[in-house]
């Protein structure tokens, strides 16, 4: 159980992140009934939030999306519940990468949008981006489409059901008659290696363990694991990026293990991809890493959030 204090600055978070100042959960509990039911009232009149409870995390994320972005989002049972601060840090970094391009219309690809479709919804709502949300799990597709419809985002977001989850872009691009150009892709890859005896035990093929999460772990096995873990998944994106240099301007991905960053950078170097940028996403006690690469001549913006 975590006692909450509003108006505290969270060190290291992106300066434009609305959650950099911790929300006043006591006020939020008064305003949002479903969230209030997951809170515990302390003797001093303040509320405590148990971040290790999955149901609490669901109501917390739903409440924050409604409060800050007027988004009504639901999650499929047993699916990944995204933490908003981290997703915002990723979106804000993409904004920073897009800024030098000075483009009026921006199109992005959300690889594995999940049931919430949160990245696409945030990108569309916050920036008016046109998003292609890719997803292979039927239940997630159903919920993602409903989330888009509920928030009247059909004109900005297309949820595409990938028939084959062994490829990233191929299925959609082969049937895309318009041959649209995309300015970026984003990805929150499955962290864990399904080849391991205990894939959700925290280990990847890298000997360094991923730090245990402070929040309750949510998500289906399909969302959290894949063959080879996040390194092999991202390498597949890199391989396909070589075939789609003209379709996507900037390729990006998040990583959950710091030691995997140099492994991805080495793989890009082996393939002679020189235009590369890295960053870190800080949100409270949790840090994630991200890598961007491009085949265009304009250097990618460097720096961390």
Curated annotation (Swiss-Prot):
Keywords: Methyltransferase, S-adenosyl-L-methionine, Transferase. GO terms for cellular component: nucleus. InterPro entries: DNA_methylase_N6_adenine_CS (IPR002052), METTL16/PsiM (IPR017182), METTL16/RlmF (IPR010286), SAM-dependent_MTases_sf (IPR029063). Belongs to the methyltransferase superfamily. METTL16/RlmF family. RNA N6-methyltransferase that mediates N6-methylation of adenine of U6 small nuclear RNA (U6 snRNA). Residues 197-221 are annotated as: Disordered. One of its GO terms (molecular function) is U6 snRNA (adenine-(43)-N(6))-methyltransferase activity. It catalyses: adenosine in U6 snRNA + S-adenosyl-L-methionine = N(6)-methyladenosine in U6 snRNA + S-adenosyl-L-homocysteine + H(+). This is U6 small nuclear RNA (adenine-(43)-N(6))-methyltransferase. Its EC number is 2.1.1.346. GO terms for biological process: rRNA base methylation. S-adenosyl-L-methionine binds at residues 87, 112, 135, 166, 188. It holds the Pfam family Methyltransf_10. The keyword S-adenosyl-L-methionine applies.
């Amino acid at each position: 159980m975590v006692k909450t204090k509003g108006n505290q600055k969270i060190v290291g978070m992106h300066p434009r992140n609305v959650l950099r100042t911790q929300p006043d959960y006591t006020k939020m509990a008064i305003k949002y009934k479903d969230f209030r039911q997951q809170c515990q009232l302390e003797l001093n009149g303040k509320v405590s939030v148990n971040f290790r409870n999955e149901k609490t995390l669901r109501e917390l994320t739903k409440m924050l999306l409604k409060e800050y972005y007027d988004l009504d989002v639901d999650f499929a049972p047993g699916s990944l519940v995204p933490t908003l601060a981290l997703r915002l840090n990723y979106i804000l970094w993409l904004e920073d990468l897009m800024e030098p391009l000075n483009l009026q219309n921006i199109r992005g690809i959300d690889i594995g949008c999940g049931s919430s479709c949160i990245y696409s919804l945030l990108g569309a709502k916050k920036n008016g981006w046109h998003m292609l949300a890719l997803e292979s799990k039927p239940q997630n597709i159903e919920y993602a489409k409903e989330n888009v419809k509920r928030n009247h985002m059909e004109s900005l977001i297309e949820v595409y059901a990938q028939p084959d989850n062994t490829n990233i872009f191929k299925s959609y691009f082969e049937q895309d008659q318009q041959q649209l150009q995309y300015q970026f892709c984003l990805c929150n890859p499955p962290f864990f290696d399904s080849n391991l005896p205990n894939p959700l035990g925290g280990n990847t093929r890298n000997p360094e363990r991923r730090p245990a999460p402070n929040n309750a772990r949510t998500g289906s096995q399909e969302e959290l694991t894949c063959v080879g873990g996040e390194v092999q998944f991202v390498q597949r994106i890199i391989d396909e990026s070589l075939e789609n240099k003209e379709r996507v301007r900037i390729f990006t991905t998040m990583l959950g293990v710091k030691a995997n960053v140099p492994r991805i950078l080495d793989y890009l170097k082996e393939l002679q991809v020189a235009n590369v940028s890295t960053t870190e996403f800080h949100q409270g006690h949790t840090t994630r890493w991200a890598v961007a690469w491009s085949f265009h001549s304009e250097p990618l913006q460097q720096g961390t959030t």
